[in-house]
Amino acid sequence: MKPPRLTDTTLRDGSHPMRHQFTRQQVATIVQALDRAGVPVIEVSHGDGLAGSSLQYGFSHTSEFDLIETARQHAERAKIAALMLPGIGTRQELKEAVARGVQVVRIATQCTEADISEQHFGLAKELGLETVGFLMMAHMRPPEELARQAKLMESYGADCVYIVDSAGAMLPQDAAARVQALKDTLSVQVGFHAHNNLGLGIANTLAALEAGADQIDGCLRGLGAGAGNAATELLAAVLDRLGLNPGLDVFSLMDAAEYVVAPIMPFQPFPDRDAITIGYAGVYSTFLLHAKRAGAQYNVDPREILVELGRRQAVAGQEDWIIDVALELSRRHQSSARKESRP
């Protein structure tokens, strides 16, 4: 293993549990703390990427462009990154983000849809950006298929391609196999982004590093969607113990998590019943509330709904399946009950 490059995404993935309510002052304080601690890349944007502020994904308290500008002003050494999802962010948003200080763009697609990112990588390269590809929900497809998708992103201009465990559903061997497949296929760097829904964020990141990952992600205090991400301060401590510290100040990151981020967190993400269900089922956390509502309407345990959605490999944008699955399960339960009641 070699020391990886760490991207802290507290100010992007952490926007989900913060309900996209970060302020300029909070961004300034967090960026300063991360920058002083030696974090080389800090991601700042709406939780769903550039232009995510909307009725569908949740409105931001402060324009993400203002937050990006604030981050750039307070980062002496770190690069500022932003997430972009084709279909949400457009050319205009990316150009504005660059004008405000973005130096790295991370372009995210569903893990089977890398082909929709070609124009976005092309524009990013025209703008002189470092480019990173994100293959989301990567637990759903086998390693060899992910490698083919990653190869497309590489051909479009990606400088690194990430395996992204969006649902926190992977086991360590899953993370290792997927990273290894990309390392065997690509000539560019490979990254890994963990979520902690099964309590394996750190373990999966270590497995990815053992398989050759060049870049990894973390959030201070684990502040991220679902049960959160691998905690940046924990990653720093573990990397230091392994002799793989890439220049991070472990104590400074511990202090940043404890005294800067913890006081503003609405709650501490952890693997509670809901988060475990998301990881166990392998679905997006955005399905959870809809499944609970459908479960109440049709008298079905929402966990059953989520597990069935995972079996059907539902992804974001297919929330309409939830009612269909709830109704189908309700009818199935009623049929079973009738059979059991017969003499």
Curated annotation (Swiss-Prot):
EC numbers on record: 4.1.3.39
Superkingdom of the organism of origin: Bacteria
UniProt keyword Manganese present: yes
Binding-site residues for substrate, renumbered to this chain: R12, D13, S166, H193, Y284
One Pfam family this sequence matches: DmpG_comm
Signal peptide: none
Binding site for Mn(2+): D13, H193, H195
Annotated site residue numbers, Transition state stabilizer: R12
Molecular functions per Gene Ontology: 2-isopropylmalate synthase activity; 4-hydroxy-2-oxovalerate aldolase activity; manganese ion binding
Annotated CDD domains: DRE_TIM_HOA (cd07943)
HAMAP family, per the entry: HOA
Similarity annotation: Belongs to the 4-hydroxy-2-oxovalerate aldolase family.
Protein name: 4-hydroxy-2-oxovalerate aldolase
